[in-house]
Amino acid sequence: MSNNTTAVTGTASADPFDDPVTSNKMAIRALIPLLITFVLGTLCLQGFNLVFQQVGAAVGAPHQASLITAFPSIVLGIVCFIYGSLGDFVSLRKLVTVGLVTLFVGSIFGFVANYFFAANLWTVIIARVLQTAGEQVAGSAFLVVATKYLRNDLKVIFFGLFTAAYQLSASIGVFAAGMLSSIAWQFLFLIPSVTILFLPILLKTLPSKSGNGQKVDAFGFVIFGFATAFLTLFFSYMAWWMLVVSLLLFVAFAFYINKASNPFITPAFFKNTRWLRAICLILVFYFVNYALSPIFNAIGTNIYGMTTTQVSLHIVWAFVVAAVVGTCSGMIIRKIGIKAGIVTAGTLMFLGWTGAAFCVNSGFVVLTLCACVFYAGCGLMYSPVVSTVLGTIEKDESGRGVGMNDLAMNVSPSIGIAIIGSLLGSNALAGGSITGVTGTAANYANLLLVAAGTALLGLIVFFVFKKKIYEGNHALETEESAK
């Protein structure tokens, strides 16, 4: 009797995430609601990015309207790393619970405070900060769960769905913001509020164990968080003292992790040369990812006499292409392999930029087709490059790996857009171009060629580092298991 009771108790208390078969099923059940939450949160983010000037005017602060997007961007820059890293130490169940509740509170507070009471700039900002901090939990948890608990051959599929979801929500956000702003912009706050209904499902399907059992290194997270915050602020305001403060904090962080007994990330993590080479792929390939929209907007406005709305209605099709390719990227990578996937994606990005550079005066429809080629490359790139980078580290470090990936994907294009943006406004490259155009068109063509050169550099980096990156890389297990 006693033995039977013990057996029953042992079975009942067994963690399904300890068994590869059951963990895979549980992970899939958790990933779907996490993905929907991420989509709705990103949709809200993109919507406010489109109408923030209208919101600023509505709350009586048109000259401070940029703060509506600036503060959430700063928060996003901090939490994208911290949430992923916390996945190695804190129960994902607890982390997601806090995130969904924060997202819900921000949504309801933002709507009630600005719809039923006098709209105020700071209630909008506070609500958007809460929403951003909450929704990013879903994105980070999705990547951690997919990395730690999914079968290798399914990882590329769900990574592809993740990037597809982001691109799709970005395109839908444009239309949602336009539609809701004509009714009342306050309703944008309510879009992600329904995700609180997923909490009961996620409480049953997410792992409850607390990572590796170590205490959370709060001091280390604070130093790194402030360093990241000042770095993000620098790219928002281009104030050099912010960059100096950020660098000093990163130096202090490096000193701290070398001296602390249990830092959340050790110096050994950064001494992993395979990871360092792999993360270079993200830093280079994603460097100009934010540049296409402003360059195309400038071309449409100054060369074709289009409005920003007309330009966005063209570019949105490129986002749709990225979403479709991203959805299919898992199947594509399973067919052609991770290495060929990165080469194909990088080539599409290069061809998209180069084609646009040579077609500046060929009509905006032609430019839109070039944008579709570029974004097809973006949609295909995410799955194999993330699999490659995370394949260079151990699974018990995957949360920190996800955090570093997110940080690289946010910081690298922020640097890129700061450089491209300054050149875009100064017409510094308007002297002439190998594409044959002159004047303002030459400036745009040369900027597009610079972006094409970045994609080409990414391919060169890949071929130079390929052998070292894939020595013992876990990502290659995907190809081997699929054969």
Region locations from a protein language model:
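Loop-to-transmembrane helix entry/capping segments in MFS-fold secondary transporters
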Residues: 62-63, 152-162, 308, 395-405
